């Protein structure tokens, strides 16, 4: 259903460093990179959704959407724990530590962070 998501940044090198560390743990590849944006996904599989970060096309400062969040499916709670630690050690901030969230369903395990620009991310597993 989703082809790609893009979040704005005010500092592309910082954003690339943050997302490279996370997506390396998720075995995602760099699909595109230039002086304006970068994307990750599965380079040879155009049906796999990609995630972009970059400077806004209109030239204005990148900003965060209120209520906007990108959730990444992860298959093991231990990887979610590691992603949360990696995000925090690379300039991200905590929005909810790793753990079960039974209010969202049996086995729903998640962690929530913000990237250095304030974009909210979730790492989720449905069958922990």
Language-model features and meaning:
Residues 10-14, 71-111, 116:
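Vicinal oxygen chelate
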Residues 35, 42-82:
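Long, continuous compositionally biased terminal/linker segments
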């Amino acid at each position: 259903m989703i082809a790609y998501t893009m979040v704005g940044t005010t500092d592309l090198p910082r954003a690339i460093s943050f997302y490279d560390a996370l997506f390396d743990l998720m075995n995602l590849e760099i699909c595109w990179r230039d002086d304006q944006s970068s994307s990750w996904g599965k380079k040879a599989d155009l049906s796999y959704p990609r995630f972009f970060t970059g400077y806004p096309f209109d030239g204005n400062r990148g900003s965060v959407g209120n209520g906007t969040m990108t959730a990444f499916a992860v298959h093991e709670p231990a990887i979610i724990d590691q992603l949360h630690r990696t995000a925090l050690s690379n300039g991200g901030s905590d929005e909810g530590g790793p753990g079960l969230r039974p209010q969202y369903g049996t086995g729903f395990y998640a962690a929530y962070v913000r990237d250095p620009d304030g974009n909210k991310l979730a790492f989720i597993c449905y069958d922990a």
